[in-house]
Curated annotation (Swiss-Prot):
This is Cis-abienol synthase, chloroplastic. One of its GO terms (molecular function) is carbon-oxygen lyase activity, acting on phosphates. It comes from Nicotiana tabacum (Common tobacco). Expressed specifically in trichomes. Residues 1-37 form a transit peptide. It catalyses: 8-hydroxycopalyl diphosphate = cis-abienol + diphosphate. Pfam families: Terpene_synth, Terpene_synth_C.
Amino acid sequence: MVLGLRSKIIPLPDHKLGNIKLGSVTNAICHRPCRVRCSHSTASSMEEAKERIRETFGKIELSPSSYDTAWVAMVPSRYSMNQPCFPQCLDWILENQREDGSWGLNPSHPLLVKDSLSSTLASLLALRKWRIGDNQVQRGLGFIETHGWAVDNKDQISPLGFEIIFPCMINYAEKLNLDLPLDPNLVNMMLCERELTIERALKNEFEGNMANVEYFAEGLGELCHWKEMMLRQRHNGSLFDSPATTAAALIYHQYDEKCFGYLNSILKLHDNWVPTICPTKIHSNLFLVDALQNLGVDRYFKTEVKRVLDEIYRLWLEKNEEIFSDVAHCAMAFRLLRMNNYEVSSEELEGFVDQEHFFTTSSGKLMNHVAILELHRASQVAIHERKDHILDKISTWTRNFMEQKLLDKHIPDRSKKEMEFAMRKFYGTFDRVETRRYIESYKMDSFKILKAAYRSSGINNIDLLKFSEHDFNLCQTRHKEELQQMKRWFTDCKLEQVGLSQQYLYTSYFIIAAILFEPEYADARLAYAKYAIIITAVDDFFDCFICKEELQNIIELVERWEGYSTVGFRSERVRIFFLALYKMVEEIAAKAETKQGRCVKDHLINLWIDMLKCMLVELDLWKIKSTTPSIEEYLSVACVTIGVPCFVLTSLYLLGPKLSKDVIESSEVSALCNCTAAVARLINDIHSYKREQAESSTNMVSILITQSQGTISEEEAIRQIKEMMESKRRELLGMVLQNKESQLPQVCKDLFWTTINAAYSIHTHGDGYRFPEEFKNHINDVIYKPLNQYSP
């Protein structure tokens, strides 16, 4: 059995794989030609795109924020309250009104009307305060009149703190004698709701709840305790890295040299506008690295990514304010650092360990859904049973929170999809399936939202889209060619004559291609897929067809190997199976010798002997003689017959790095292999228990129930196995990410994790081999259907 599966050889019907004709790949699934070659101009264009992407590291800019720029424009001069301190911001506002009279990121976006209303009103306040731009003011009022319906529309994406800030700006407009064309009843309702929100916050200030509205301090106006607020001023002079809030402190409180210095430093960078958050370096670099990984092209920028993560790690160790003052930054930094082999402690996330504490001590900036999503993602990378209990608690409350949010019928579709994806275990998905979905949903006009919507030029651009799409299609072309090779091999080995459908090739190859997808790993990928087919086939034979004597015959043939002709074949199916095995191992051994510079064939043969002898134990002692093994006895055998030692250790030789005999036989490799095999076996046993019970096959669930003498129910047995499985999974991830004293190259350690990822992925929606329709869609997406998001 392979990848945690003990599957019957059930042919997938032709209609389930898009009427595949086994003799012609051009008719397979999507009816597209197999070979696609890139022109010289295309290759050159992609190289140029790659260089432009490389240049974006450290140079990413956020879009101008009309909202924040307007607040900065309202700051009076330190020398005269009747003059603006930053007149250049007023000039920017005058020059950047949209044709419809609005200001904002994208007034035509159907879900950003509230954002446009907020930015427009802030801009009108700045113009009216300094008595300029009468024409622009009238046009802006016209926009508010025609779009005022969105103020209380629950289907709109709302800027953070809108319910506090927008009514405050309405009050300010009245003081400036700016008559807003809004429904008076709606205005009164908003003002009442704002007062109640502020009253609750001020009443519970000493209990921590005031933190919920501090980020929206410009919406508190004179009600804000600005003197106390200034105690939260950051080293860079800002309040919460927000230009708008910092500007409000200068408007409502008093002149502060550090606040002025902060705003002035931003304007030195951008001349006459400000973004909605600054500084942006850590923010932008984290999101860029995450985007590159999600797009599946981070391998092209290893040097740049490492440079960014090294810098983030240095700042992490220094407890840098820009990282730790923002929960989304902190959570994302933790996840990216841990998953890229940096040693980081989950104790740094202790402040977010429960929902109530999070919402009563976090500023409003931290409470947007992005922060919750990033916290949940960070909680999934636990590697310590005891040390990472903090992550378990975070995982529980963030999942519950998102589940409740998903019940809200007004939740924007964009947020809904993000939450649904975040709630899926990151180790229970096929990488290339998710990469395709990410590319398909990638939009150059994508935005994020704080108190104003914003976009990042370096993260949402045409180069990233074109480059990732081109790379996906190149890999896809390679996969189609490899699948053709697999089909020729399958036919040459006559495996159909022993009951194995050729259509099984698609699923077997897809499982590894969807995770170990890089072109340079073609040899390892093909070996892995072939082993998957042969191991699953022999396992099913022994379960249902082959007698004990035939298995003993196969073992003797493998033990003799070069002298197999002196042994003879007990049956035709034994002959077909052994010759397929022999040809496969000989071919792989030759390739491995070329890559390793030494002969490893004896090791490959011994791996098969060990597995076959363990299969004999399963067949003879446990099935024929109905002996029930102890848990220890069962795992010592079943973790070998699952196939992990055989196909993973074999594939290691083909990944590229040279591995000495000492490394292969090291305790590190042994521990990785044992842990991987245990997880794969336990995954298999949980999902195949009912079927194996009907077949009288031994299974971990049945052993626990039997040994308990009726004191453990089936549900309890499965719960205990899941606990064992989770413990082993974390242990494995910890070993894979551990750099200290590791002899094994990272790409080799990753293959063990890849194997577990595949096993979990297969069973995410049940036994993948028993749900061919879903796998048909996955195979189409990863191997056959080209991406075409970008249309030049």
